[in-house]
């Protein structure tokens, strides 16, 4: 099923698989979202939950409050990006997707949760709202959440990657940890100014 929001400026499509964006086209038909060429990266815009990035050996070790010496296996970027979400169209400019913890997720991440993702289309802007609802009464749940959209670059055949740049409205003063792309792990002690 094609899930779509459309206005005069953009046509945006979504997938129940991962509750994610699958296409962003302007009024001229230019595709802005990466279309998942597996030669480079098969993803498009996965939702990352309950982790962003990687864990050493994919192991999540939970404290005694959860289960004594319990270890779960959480792959890079979490448990939901390759799961089917329930879809609900709210109105002509808003769709939502929902995923509820199940037997499979509870084996690796011992928390009951509902993850709602709400997408809104306004002019040439798409906003994403994440809602993590805990069903846990006695404890809070640890998590990270994030979006990982891939964008086409270059957009036109006569352009090259080097024609593009990012411009920030403010000078950036943070430092970033050294990363190891093969594992997705970070060295928090070795930082580079950004």
Task: Locate each region found by the language model.
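Active-site/ligand-binding surface loops and adjacent short beta/alpha elements
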Residues: 140, 150-194
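Short, hydrophobic/aromatic beta-strand segments
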Residues: 23-25, 139-145, 177
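Beta-strand-rich N-terminal accessory domains
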Residues: 1-61, 66
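Residues that act as N-cap/strand-start positions at coil-to-secondary-structure junctions
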Residues: 6-8, 18, 54, 79-82, ...
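Broad, structure-driven detector of short, well-ordered beta-strand segments within folded domains
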Residues: 11-14, 117-119, 166
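Hydrophobic residues embedded in beta-strands of well-ordered beta-sheets
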Residues: 3, 22, 95, 126-128
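Extended, loop-rich substrate-binding clefts of extracytoplasmic carbohydrate-active enzymes
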Residues: 70-123
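Acidic, contiguous internal or C-terminal segments within carbohydrate-active enzymes
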Residues: 5, 101-149
């Amino acid at each position: 099923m094609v899930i779509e929001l459309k206005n005069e400026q953009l046509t945006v499509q979504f997938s129940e698989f991962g509750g994610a964006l699958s296409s962003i086209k302007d009024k001229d038909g230019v595709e802005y979202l990466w279309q998942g060429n597996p030669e480079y990266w098969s993803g498009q815009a996965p939702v990352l939950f309950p982790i962003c990035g990687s864990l050493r050996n994919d192991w999540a070790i939970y404290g005694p409050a959860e289960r004594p010496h319990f270890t779960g296996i959480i792959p890079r970027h979490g448990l939901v990006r390759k799961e089917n979400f329930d879809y609900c169209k709210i109105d002509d400019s808003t769709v939502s997707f929902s995923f509820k913890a199940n037997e499979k997720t509870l084996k690796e991440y011992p928390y009951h949760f509902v993850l709602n993702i709400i997408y809104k289309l306004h002019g040439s802007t798409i906003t994403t709202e994440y809602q993590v609802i805990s069903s846990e009464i006695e404890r809070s749940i640890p998590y990270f959440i994030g979006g990982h959209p891939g964008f086409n670059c270059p957009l036109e055949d006569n352009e090259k990657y080097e024609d593009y740049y990012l411009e920030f409205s403010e000078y950036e003063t943070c430092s970033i940890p050294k990363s190891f792309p093969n594992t997705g792990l970070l060295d928090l002690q070795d930082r580079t100014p950004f």
